């Protein structure tokens, strides 16, 4: 009988918890779960393939000791812990995967991966992550590319406040993507655009949405597509009116300069929800056989139960994407050394994976961007 492959997971929040459930259900992985919070770790039930370790990630020596001997470390922590975890993975020589959307953190991972003997694969979630894989797949079908617009959103099914929003994932991550510069391509040149700008609209299944620039979701596609496309952008999907309120909070009230306060305000006033939907909307236009063609990928993914526990759509999609990449790495289906970008991953391989199948539920769009 094959022994389970040892994996270290750092971060026992909602995404980390979902990753644990998905991997344990297979019986193929043994897990060391590391988190600084005893209260958070106490919620996990005993399992023969699960080892719980309470450890502050910032204690580098102890972190490296906890990570040593594992096939890979999966980081489901806030973006500001990425660098210390990635550096520890390099030191102990294990593979490294994370969910970060932060540009600076990813640049750090890219740099240290140059000397790595293992694989360093950041941005393994939904966006960046799956969105890059599906966008590259569509783009490969064109002879000449004109424009690419990538849109992703995790939204409440039943919005009931003036923000038309509920907290469905990391508050730190939301604030970061609303504040930091956004990499995009305009007129064939890579530029930095302001977050919350370039407001656009589209409809899907009879429901209207707004989209606007946010940071990080584009991943490494701006580099991969350099010189190949005239226009490339990544935008977040929200219900109409959300963007204007966030601009008021961040810019007019200057909470962009007081992010800890904004986080406190949001977490005390905006409820979380498990009743959410993840929207993925990618539109590519360009030439095929000398004809100008537009191709759109549209998908809605809903919350579901995993091991009898209801998980939100953003938890399911984010955790499943990382687990799929781990599986592909373990099976030798993607590069096993150096810096690995998401768009190198074959879409068919991803969707054929036991975890990636969650993305196979596709709903054709009944509207189009305008």
Indicate where each model-derived feature is located.
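Rossmann-fold NAD(P)-binding glycine/threonine-rich loop
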Residues: 99-122
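N-terminal Rossmann-like NAD(P) cofactor-binding module of classical short-chain dehydrogenase/reductase
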Residues: 67-76, 96-98
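Conserved Rossmann-fold cofactor-binding substructure of NAD(P)-dependent oxidoreductases
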Residues: 57-69
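Helix N-cap at the beta1-alpha1 junction of Rossmann-like dinucleotide-binding domains, i.e.
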Residues: 37-40, 103
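Conserved N-terminal Rossmann-fold NAD(P)-binding element of oxidoreductases
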Residues: 7-11
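C-terminal catalytic/substrate-binding lobe primarily of soluble NAD(P)-dependent oxidoreductases
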Residues: 4, 141-370
């Amino acid at each position: 009988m094959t022994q389970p492959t040892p994996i270290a997971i750092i971060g026992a929040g909602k995404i980390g918890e979902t990753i644990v459930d998905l991997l344990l259900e297979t019986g193929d992985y043994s897990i060391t779960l590391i988190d600084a919070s005893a209260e958070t770790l106490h919620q996990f039930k005993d399992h023969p393939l699960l080892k719980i370790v309470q450890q502050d990630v910032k204690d580098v020596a102890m972190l490296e000791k906890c990570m040593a001997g594992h096939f890979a470390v999966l980081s489901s922590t806030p973006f500001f812990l990425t660098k210390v975890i990635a550096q520890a993975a390099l030191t102990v020589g294990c593979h490294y995967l994370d969910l970060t959307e932060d540009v600076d953190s990813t640049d750090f991972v890219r740099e240290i991966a140059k000397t790595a003997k293992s694989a360093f694969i950041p941005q393994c979630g939904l966006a960046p992550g799956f969105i890059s894989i599906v966008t590259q797949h569509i783009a490969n079908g064109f002879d000449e590319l004109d424009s690419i617009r990538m849109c992703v959103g995790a939204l409440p099914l039943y919005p009931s406040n003036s923000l038309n929003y509920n907290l469905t994932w990391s508050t730190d991550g939301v604030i970061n993507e609303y504040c930091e510069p956004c990499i995009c391509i305009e007129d064939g040149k890579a530029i930095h655009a302001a977050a919350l700008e370039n407001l656009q609209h589209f409809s899907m299944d009879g429901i209207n949405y707004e989209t606007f620039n946010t940071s990080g979701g584009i991943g490494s596609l701006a580099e991969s597509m350099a010189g190949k496309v005239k226009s490339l952008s990544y935008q977040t999907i929200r219900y109409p009116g959300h963007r204007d309120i966030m601009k008021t909070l961040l810019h007019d009230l200057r909470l962009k300069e007081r992010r800890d306060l904004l986080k406190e305000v949001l977490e005390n006033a905006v409820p979380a929800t498990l009743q959410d939907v993840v929207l993925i909307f990618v539109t590519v236009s360009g030439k095929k056989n000398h004809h100008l063609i537009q191709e759109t990928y549209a998908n809605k993914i809903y919350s579901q139960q995993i091991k009898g526990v209801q998980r939100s759509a953003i938890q399911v999609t984010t955790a499943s994407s990382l687990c799929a990449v781990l599986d592909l790495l373990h099976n030798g289906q993607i590069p096993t050394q150096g810096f690995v970008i998401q768009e190198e991953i074959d879409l068919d391989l991803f969707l054929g994976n036991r975890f990636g199948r969650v993305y196979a539920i596709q709903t054709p769009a009944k509207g189009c961007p305008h």
